[in-house]
A protein has these predicted regions:
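Short S/T/G/P-rich N-terminal loop/turn motif that feeds into the first structured element of a domain
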Residues: 1-86
């Protein structure tokens, strides 16, 4: 099960941290979801996941539900960078 780390910018870090949407949209696809905030760049964050099925993970990112969750969370989609454990 690879670990995925995604970095991106958000509109409001406190809102993003408190949001239940991450867990809802990745339920059954990702486990051990952990959040991180950049210490000096106030809107840069990261999230780490353990993902069993990369195809399902990528499908969520491209889905309407994924887009709605990102919008709700204030994610700036154009800033997303995904890293896969090597």
């Amino acid at each position: 099960m690879p670990k995925i780390v995604a970095t991106h910018e958000v509109e409001d870090v406190a809102h993003w941290l408190a949001s239940p949407k991450r867990a809802e949209v990745f339920d059954g696809i990702a486990t051990d979801i952990r959040t991180f905030v950049h210490p000096t760049e106030k809107n840069r964050v990261a999230v780490a996941f353990d993902v069993a099925d990369m195809d399902k993970f990528e499908a969520v990112l491209k889905s309407e539900a994924g887009a709605a969750a990102m919008k709700y969370d204030g994610v700036r989609p154009e800033t997303i960078v995904v890293y896969i454990e090597g």
